[in-house]
Each structure stands twice: as structure tokens, then as C-alpha cells.
Amino acid sequence: MEARPSGVVAATGVRRAFGDAVVLGGVDLFVEPGEIVALLGASGSGKSTLLRVLAGLDEDAEGEVHTSGSKAVVFQEHRLLPWKRVVDNVALGVRGKDAKQRAATALEEVGLAERGKAWPSELSGGQSQRVAFARALVREPELLLLDEPFGALDALTRLKMQALFARLHEAHGFAALLVTHDVDEALLLADRLLVLDGGRIAEEIKVDLGHPRSVDMEGFAVLRRRLLGLLHVPTET
């Protein structure tokens, strides 16, 4: 597949090995502006490795990777600096005299307008992850790279964060690559699904379900069964 440079992400032949273990064996991946792409695969399939390559955090990978515009990364761990207040964590690295005001605006967007002066240790897990999203949003990224950002949250908080992500995407229109192991999450949020297997993209699925989505909407269960089959997860018949 030829890279299409008009995309937010155009990657071809991405290869990454750790010693004799080849984790990525020639991955081709493309993300359109404003598109949400979910990347799924078994544990150890190389999902997080691929995201790190696309984020520019792995200099030992081979292949061609092109990203256009600004990008931000949200990890499963919020990685907030405990010695800085919440608003200062969000403003960290942001240039300009209005950096703190922009950080405060981003916190308001994620529902934490009143927590700017709090310390990270005073936040719940869900609040900490909201701060991580605010820290990404304040940079006004064209591309958001997310490595299982809701994986450490309880079920209810996870649903709330998924809804927040959908609202933020609607408001800002950024492209996103979402690494997740949650099939329902992928189907609820993504425009397109990629299954990573054997070091390559083994399957691509277009999600034509419309918005807003729910697990009981028509067509959801069919796509869910198909995706679980591709991931080699047994399903009830």
C-alpha cells in the first residue's frame, strides 16, 4: 500500500524487532483527518509498540512514518507530575502568556473547571484521566494517539470517559488512533477498526453505525461477533 501524504498518518512497512522477536513485521496504516481508528489485537501483538512508533517515541523502528500537524498522546497512566497543581500540569510545555488561561479552558471542557488548584493526589482515577485529556487538548492537536486510556478505570467511569471522548471529538474534530482491548469501546467510538495479528494489519472493518451509538442498536451485535472471531475470542451461538 502506498502512503497517501494527505492523511494525518501515513505509515508503510513499519517494522520493529526486539532481538530475534519481530513484533511488527511490516505494518501499513493510514488515518484520515478527523477519523477515529481503533487498533485491536491480542496481548503482545504490538499495539502499544506501533503507537509509540507513530508518536515518534521509538527511534529503532524501521519503515516510513509520516504525520501531519500537531499530535498529542494519552496513555493509560495519566503521568501527572505530583509536585505541580492540576492547571500547571495541563499548561506544562505550552507556550505563550495565555498558557495558564488555555489550560483552565481545557479543564473546563473536561468538566474540571473547579479542580485547577488541586494536587494530582487529590484526584480520583477518572478525574486524573480527564486532566490527561485536557493536557492533550490544550495543544490543539490534529492527531490524538491513545494507548488504552480508559483501561485502568472502573466500568462506570469508563463509560463516562468514552462519552466525554465522543463529545470532545465532535467539538474539535481531531483524528485519533485508539489502542484498546475493549471490543465494545472500539465499536462505540471508531469509524474504522484495525486488527493487528502476526505483526501486520490482518483485518480492516468499516463501522457504519451512525451516531450516537449504543450496544443494543441494530448491527452492533453482528459487528461485535465478527470482531471477536477475528480476535479468536469464543462467542455464544
Where are these predicted regions, by residue range?
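The feature captures the beta-strand-to-loop junction immediately N-terminal to the Walker
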Residues: 40-42
